[in-house]
Amino acid sequence: MSFTNVSHSIPYALVGLVVVAIASIKWLRVAQREHYVPGYVVRFASRWYFSRESTANTSIAVVLAFAFIAAISRPHSPEVAIPALALGVVAAVFSPVGLGYKGRSSKLAWTRRAKVLYASTLAITAVLSVLAYLANLSAGLATVFVIFSPLLMDLASYVTRPFERRALDPFVKSAAAKLDQVNPVRVGITGSYGKTSTKNYIAQLASESLTELASPASFNNRGGLARAVNENLLPGTQVFIAEMGTYQKGEIASLVEWVKPNIVAITAIGPVHLERFGSEDAILEAKREIATDASTVVLNVDDKRLAGLADELEREGRHVVRASGTDTAREVSVVKDDAGNAAVYHHQRYLGSTSTPVALSNLAVAVAITLELGVPEEVIGKGLGGLKAASSRLNVVTTEAGVTVIDDTYNSNPAGARLALAQLEAHASQGGRRVVVTPGMVELGSQQYDENRALGVAIGVAATHICIVGLTNRRALLAGAKEGGGRLITLLEFRTRERAVEWVRQNLGSGDAVLYENDLPDHFA
């Protein structure tokens, strides 16, 4: 290779392509975890490189900035272009520090979509490399490509997104036809949080009277729901319960178009996914799409915005059922009784209670839907006694060592975190240690720092130890925990959840309790 011919050199162009091929593997993992939403790879790259908590990555970002400036200012100079390319190659392959290729908790799955996105990223890079070669800018633009490999992947996401949507069309059409053929009552559930728990409660309470199918796990998007129907909906199924999630306006409307739910519910409106929507009013507008054509709408009217929506829909002639976790005057309500159990009422008539830790409003919505499905009150009352929490949502177990473990690792939100801390206080023995292991909460937009600081304050009051995992919300949690005072005596920091769990195993004993509040995949810092 001639070092003097850096402007018009196939080897230099190939270097850029090969390095992008390597670096893109870790960014593909990020894209997959973020549901292939265009723009999110660059967003996460920015977080990794410009986090206040990582001076190493910020320093690398500064070096890359100099390499970029050098590459575009003097692309024909081998004395400048070659060192700039070398810096870009090393940084692209080995940084950001902490973001691995394999991943500990969020490994890359080489699905068809992942392969298409990866190949598209390389194809775009190859085309740009050819153009760079023809423009006599091989080494200079190769440096730019390796530095901006996250941007190239996001560009590929934009390009392939329409094709991916069309690729799903046959599966969606098949699912819609199968729903029409089997013709179950269709229930749609959405909300900022509480969707999966509410779906789980409905399935349990209705199963004694009806043959039901609930969409598995968090299969709550177009592809997931189509797969759930195509693979699991059997002839004779009387009820299909579909959890419906959204990352942008119009997504739920596209689900409603083919699922055609008869009964729908909105569990809550809150700051979860606020960074994607921009405001809670925008979240409400996206969530209310679920009620477009439904004959029955169940709403958690403890939320003032949903109470207003209930009045609006009722004026339109809809059948609206108001559910509450505080007000027994509502059609369905769930409140704490003197024993601390969740007591369920229908038109102020007692149905039964459960000792299972639940978000009261979620259970109220679930009972309201189950009643609308025609399940008798006495069957619901009996089912409440054996109600189980959804996986990783306030599951409580006691280990052989006598440690109470509260697992609330799935999809933490401000309301759920408060409930989880109450459970920690309720289950800890007198004098026992109360430990919270948490990375904090994410996707809260402009409220993220304040909400995590508030969580830190609450932990400071309820716990004796806080184990902060990772860097994402470290500053906010630390500030809140120190401000909270209360029982808190120890602040611990761990780079990974595995290390925090190991500390818990080595240090806690009989009478102690630990709450695992949220668990972020490792593409978060």
State each model region's role.
Residues 221, 226-314, 442-453:
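Flexible active-site lid/hinge loop adjacent to a nucleotide/diphosphate
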Residues 30, 153-182:
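Transmembrane-cytosolic junction motif
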Residues 174-218:
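Walker A (P-loop) phosphate-binding motif
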Residues 69-85, 111, 125-135, 227, ...:
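Extended acidic/charged loop-beta regions that coordinate divalent cations
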Residues 188, 213-215, 239-243, 297-299, ...:
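Short catalytic-loop micro-motif centered on adjacent basic/acidic residues
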Residues 1-137, 143-162, 371-378, 382-392, ...:
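ATP-dependent carboxylate-amine ligase
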Residues 266-404, 429-432, 457-465, 473-492:
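Acidic, Mg2+-coordinating active-site environments of NTP-dependent enzymes
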